[in-house]
Amino acid sequence: ATQDVAGAIRLVPVTCARATLIETRISAETPPDKGRAAMVGRLDRFGMALAPRKVVPHREADLAAALRDAAAQTPRSDLIMVLTGSATSDPLDVAPAAVRAAGGKVLRFGMPVDPGNLLFLGELSGRPVLGLPGCARSPALNGADWVLERLVCGIDVSSADIAAMGVGGLLKEIPTRPRPRRSDAQ
């Protein structure tokens, strides 16, 4: 029986030392610190640091330039993340288009996990680019956490891996949710 489950669980050390978070803004105002603070909390669990804050206008050209700069300044083992000021709702939206404009590619758009379904995963100059869904502004568990945990350990994440996360992917009423959603019966 032991042979049947060999390899079912594997512990892998964190290989990333640092992550870069690029935020976009819709107006001239800098976005609230809520999203960055939530990501600092997530990265602290892994002993990782977050690079200094980078906020750019929510435009493809501006974000593409910031992505190119981040790729030039980031070791290949580290992670680039994008948190947009407006929801990334399709593969042609500003953030995925900026990854392509910067010379990268989008490997997966969307995931069958809620919250977190508007995530995208890309690659730029050999580095992963994680497009964070809006729910990443909250410290509550979401689908981006499942992808982040693998990426920071240097585990390649494929489109098929993300698709497989749909089994058990409804995270709405997890025990750690600070305020449970109301049910229709109430």
Where is each model-derived feature located?
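Electropositive, gly/pro-rich neighborhoods at or near active sites that engage anionic ligands
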Residues: 1-3
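Glycine-rich phosphate/diphosphate-binding loop of Rossmann-like nucleotide-binding domains
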Residues: 5-58, 62
